[in-house]
């Protein structure tokens, strides 16, 4: 009877060690996945924020500016 309880205890300890490693692996993989998911979102937010407050003209604005400068040159 003493032997069976010892056997059960050692099996339980082995099981807990395996589950502990599984928990660590899950935390690591989850953290890496979360990092890459938020990295992309932060990059998009950063680009949107910078687009609001920088003076970059759009392509359509550039085309209209070029056409106005060409028409002004032709008038001179």
Swiss-Prot record:
What is the recorded name of this protein?
A: Putative uncharacterized transmembrane protein DDB_G0291326
Is Transmembrane helix there in the keyword field? yes
> Where in the cell?
Membrane
The annotated topology with respect to the bilayer is: Single-pass membrane protein
GO terms for cellular component: membrane
- Compositionally biased residues, Low complexity: 60-76
Keywords recorded for this protein, A-Z = Membrane, Transmembrane, Transmembrane helix
Question: What are the transmembrane regions?
Answer: 21-38
Q: What is its main location?
A: membrane
């Amino acid at each position: 009877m003493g032997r069976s309880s010892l056997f059960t205890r050692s099996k339980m300890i082995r099981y807990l060690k395996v589950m502990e490693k599984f928990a660590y692996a899950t935390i690591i993989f989850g953290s890496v996945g979360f990092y890459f998911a938020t990295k992309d979102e932060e990059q998009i937010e950063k680009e949107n924020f910078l687009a609001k407050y920088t003076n970059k003209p759009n392509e359509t604005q550039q085309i209209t500016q070029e056409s106005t400068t060409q028409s002004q040159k032709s008038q001179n």
